Swiss-Prot record:
Optimum temperature is 55 degrees Celsius. The enzyme activity decreases rapidly at temperatures above 60 degrees Celsius. One of its GO terms (biological process) is glycogen biosynthetic process. This is Maltokinase. In the presence of 20 mM MgCl(2), the addition of CaCl(2), CoCl(2), FeSO(4), MnCl(2), BaCl(2) or CuCl(2) at a concentration of 1 mM to the enzyme assay led to a decrease of activity between 20% (FeSO(4)) and 83% (CoCl(2)). Keywords: ATP-binding, Carbohydrate metabolism, Glycogen biosynthesis, Glycogen metabolism, Kinase, Nucleotide-binding, Transferase. Inhibited by EDTA. It comes from Actinoplanes missouriensis. InterPro entries: Kinase-like_dom_sf, Mak_N_cap. Optimum pH is 8.5. It is an enzyme of class 2 (transferase). Monomer. It catalyses: D-maltose + ATP = alpha-maltose 1-phosphate + ADP + H(+). It comes from the Bacteria.
């Protein structure tokens, strides 16, 4: 069985090789999961020497739902059968959920249901269209199956930390319901996970930007007077993040570590080489980091890539999602303990983005810039107050360290924006100016 993956893969939104030239595509394995359903692992090599492994659930039956026929149809195999992406076939995804429910084994693939959970086997599945790097299938209002498109062997931190937090009863994550993995000579390889679905939820980024937009729309009102004031939600978000940190510390432990001076200085050098606008700040940034030579930090497992787009507000609570860590980093590095200040800094940076991204075309408007700063300061303070209420320690009391983690994040952002959104580069540069000033 050979399908034309070389033509189909580059058209998928989760394909990560668009900036590289494809050299070869070959099927590494095909595991039958049913009469007309195979789990296929596809190895991709690029001309620059890099490689990736992708996961595709291939269906051979009547085909996907008609509205998805274009994106899901892979093509005709060498045996004459037509293959398609089975995640767009409700019968196939219901079958996958059933395999999780029975903790089934198929070849080298194992499915595992979490203890004491019930899966919505009769629910109607639909693909979540907004997903980028993975593909998720929602089962009514009850569960969501996330299939990892790029397969990397090792313990997946998203599954690992959701399992720890769920079994500990932390209320600020969507409970893990099950998972699936394969095994090869390198060890276990996580393939997907099933969690509770956060029905009737709103993304933190959307809520925050709406609040800032409301403030800018009424030139006479203060941040605490507009209808979309976000301060209370920021306080509760701080409490939620601190709660997750506390549970992870209790369940997985903490320890001392030196401030990662070499790593942050290396990121500065790399970013400055790619972003000319950053070079004038390098001496001041370097001095800020080198002032922490010999500093010791308390490290533990953390989210690792926390920002307002990684949190959901349900009617009951804030939820933290996507514990996969910083994208692009090796799996073992994403599982390394880090300072909780890394997550705090990520949220604080995100407040600046929520406000200032609305002003990228009006950067010379001093009045709007002042109102943006008012909104940012108000919500940063509320978040830290909420965090302190649960953690028992104020992250602002570690001012030099917290600023260093913010600065490290802003340097990363500058490199990202210069490459992908040059019009937004002024946002991290504004923050760097403030942090080193």
């Amino acid at each position: 069985m050979t399908l034309p993956f070389a033509e189909w893969l580059p058209k998928q939104r989760w394909y990560a090789g668009r900036s590289r030239v494809l050299a070869s595509v070959k099927e590494a394995s095909a595991t039958p999961l049913g009469e007309e359903l195979d789990l296929v692992l596809v190895d991709v090599e690029y001309t620059d020497g890099s490689s990736e492994r992708y996961q595709v659930m291939v269906g051979w039956g009547d085909g996907p739902l008609p509205e998805y026929s274009t994106i899901a149809s892979i093509g005709t195999a060498d045996d004459g059968r037509d293959g398609y992406d089975a995640l767009y076939d409700p019968r196939a995804t219901r079958h996958l959920l059933g395999l999780v429910d029975t903790s089934a084994t198929a070849g080298d693939v194992t499915f595992e249901k979490e203890p004491g959970v019930e899966l919505p086997l009769e629910a109607w599945p639909r693909v979540f269209d907004a997903e980028q790097s993975n593909t998720s299938v929602i089962f009514d209002e009850d569960a969501i199956l996330k299939l990892f498109r790029r397969v990397t062997c090792g313990v997946n931190p998203d599954i690992e930390l959701n399992r720890v937090l769920g079994r500990a009863g932390n209320p600020h994550v969507a409970r893990l319901l099950g998972s699936l993995q394969s095994a090869d000579d390198s060890g276990p390889c996580s393939l997907g996970m099933v969690t509770e679905y956060a029905a009737n939820s709103a993304e933190g980024w959307a809520m925050a930007t709406a609040s800032a937009r409301d403030l800018f729309a009424d030139a006479e009102m203060r941040a605490d007077e507009v209808g979309g004031d976000f301060q209370g939600e920021s306080y509760r978000l701080g409490e939620a993040v601190a709660s997750v940190h506390r549970t992870l510390a209790e369940e997985l432990g903490t320890g001392p570590a030196p401030f990662p001076l070499d790593a942050v200085l290396a990121r500065v050098r790399t970013a400055a080489a790619a972003v000319p606008e950053l070079q004038q700040f390098v001496p001041a940034i370097t001095a800020r980091f080198e002032a922490l030579t010999g500093a010791e930090v308390v490290v533990q497992r953390v989210h690792g890539d926390l920002h307002l787009g990684q949190v959901l507000r349900t009617p009951e609570a804030w939820l933290l999602i996507d514990f996969e860590g910083e994208p692009g980093q090796p799996l073992d590095e994403r599982r390394m303990p880090d300072s909780p200040l890394r997550d705090v800094a990520g949220v604080l940076r995100s407040y600046e983005y929520a406000a200032y991204q609305l002003l990228v075309d009006q950067d010379d408007d001093e009045h709007l810039a002042a109102r943006a700063r008012e909104w940012v300061d108000r919500n940063r303070a509320a978040f830290c107050d909420g965090y302190t209420n649960v953690a028992g320690a104020d992250p602002r009391e570690q001012g030099a360290l917290l600023s260093a983690y913010e600065l490290d994040k802003a340097v990363y952002e500058a490199a990202y924006e210069a490459r992908h959104r040059p019009g937004w580069l002024r946002i991290p540069l504004r923050s760097i100016t403030r942090l080193v000033g």
